[in-house]
A protein has these predicted regions:
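Short beta-strand/loop motif that positions the catalytic acidic residue
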Residues: 216, 221-224
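Primarily recognizes the serine-hydrolase "nucleophile elbow" in alpha/beta-hydrolase
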Residues: 126-215
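Short beta-strand element of the alpha/beta-hydrolase
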Residues: 70-79
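Short amphipathic alpha-helix adjacent to the substrate-entry channel of hydrolases
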Residues: 87-106
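Acidic catalytic loop of the alpha/beta-hydrolase fold
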Residues: 200-201, 226-232
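N-terminal cap/lid segment of alpha/beta-hydrolase-fold proteins
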Residues: 2-68, 117
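Catalytic nucleophile-loop/oxyanion-hole region of alpha/beta-hydrolase
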Residues: 86-88, 108-139, 260-265
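C-terminal catalytic histidine-bearing segment of alpha/beta-hydrolase fold enzymes
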Residues: 235-281
C-alpha cells in the first residue's frame, strides 16, 4: 500500500497547456515533454528504480468542496527516502483532511533516485508557479501557499525553499532548459510543514544558522515523535530556527516513531496554524 502509485495524467495534460479546474480533481504533468530541466541522465537500460526511465513528474490537484471558501493552498510531498513516494500513507490522507479544513491541496509526484533533490525541488517550484498563476481560479490569495513534506518529501520542500524558490528556474540546473510563461511567476511559498523532516539532506539536518539564513525561510511547523531516530536533530533544528527569529511551531508526539503519515491527530492543529500564518501575510 505504501508503494502504491498515484494515477498519472491520462493525456498529455500539463500545467502549461491545461486550464485549472477549481471544481474537479486534475492530474497534470509538471513539464512539457521535451523541456524538463535535469542534470541526471536516466536511460532505458537503468532498471530497479521505483519510476521508469521516462517518468514525468506530475501534480494532483484536489480542490475544496463546492461552496467552501478556500483558506489557501498546500503543496504536499510524500516520504520514501527518494526510493519511493508513500502517497497513500502520507500525502493523500493528509490532503483529504486539509481539504475538509478548507485548503486547496496539490500532491506532487516529484522525481526520485537516480535524480537528485535539486531536480525534485524544481518540480515543487513548478507546482507552486501553477497555483500562483491560477490563484484567482482557486479562490485564494497568491501568497497563501504552503509547502510541506514527510521525511524525504520535507527535505524536498526544504531544498525548494533554500535554493529553488522565487525567481530561480530550470536554467539554474540545466542550461538547455528553455524558460516558459510559468517561469515568469515567482515560486513563492509562505509556510512550510516539516513532518518528521528538516532542512538539509537525507538523514542529515543542517544546523548552521548562516546556511539556513541564506534561504530566507518562511514560518515552519514541525511534527515528529519522540521515538524517531532523528528526534534529536528535529529538536536541535527547531531551536536553531527559533533562535534565528523564524516563526516556528511544533507538535511532538510522545512515543511515536518515524513515518506515521497523517496519523497522530496533528493535522487539525497544523491547519489552524496555517490559517494564522496566512492571515499575517
Amino acid at each position: 500500500y505504501m508503494l502504491k502509485k498515484m494515477p498519472e495524467p491520462e493525456q498529455n495534460d500539463t500545467v502549461l497547456n491545461t486550464d485549472a479546474d477549481p471544481d474537479n480533481i486534475q492530474v497534470l504533468y509538471l513539464w512539457e515533454e521535451e523541456n524538463v530541466p535535469a542534470k541526471t541522465t536516466f536511460t532505458k537500460d537503468m532498471t530497479g528504480y521505483f519510476d521508469d526511465w521516462d517518468f514525468r513528474p506530475y501534480v494532483t490537484a484536489i480542490p475544496v468542496r463546492k461552496g467552501v471558501t478556500p483558506k489557501g493552498a498546500v503543496v504536499l510531498m510524500a516520504g520514501g527516502a527518494y526510493q519511493f513516494r508513500g502517497n497513500y500513507t502520507d500525502s493523500l490522507p493528509t490532503a483529504a483532511a486539509l481539504r475538509e479544513y478548507g485548503f486547496q491541496t496539490f500532491i506532487v509526484d516529484y522525481r526520485l533516485s537516480p535524480y537528485t533533490q535539486e531536480e525534485g525541488a524544481l518540480d515543487v517550484a513548478r507546482a507552486v508557479r501553477f497555483i500562483r498563476k491560477n490563484a484567482d481560479v482557486y479562490g485564494i490569495d497568491p501568497d497563501d501557499i504552503a509547502v510541506m513534506g514527510f521525511s524525504a518529501g520535507g527535505i524536498q520542500a526544504g531544498e525548494f525553499l533554500m535554493h529553488y524558490d522565487e525567481d530561480v528556474n530550470g536554467t539554474a540546473l540545466d542550461s538547455s532548459y528553455v524558460p516558459d510563461e510559468l517561469d515568469q511567476i515567482p515560486a513563492h511559498a509562505s509556510a512550510d510543514g516539516m513532518i518528521y523532516s528538516f532542512y538539509g539532506r537525507l538523514s542529515v539536518g543542517n544546523m548552521d544558522p548562516d546556511w539556513l539564513s541564506e534561504g530566507d525561510l518562511p514560518p515552519t511547523f514541525y511534527v515528529y515523535g519522540t521515538e524517531d531516530p532523528f528526534y534529536d536533530q528535529f529538536e536541535e533544528q527547531y531551536d536553531v530556527l527559533k533562535n534565528m527569529g523564524i516563526q516556528t511551531s511544533r507538535i511532538v508526539l510522545s512515543g511515536w516513531p518515524h513515518g506515521f503519515g497523517s496519523d497522530g491527530g496533528w493535522v487539525k492543529q497544523y491547519a489552524e496554524w496555517l490559517e494564522e500564518i496566512f492571515k499575517q501575510e
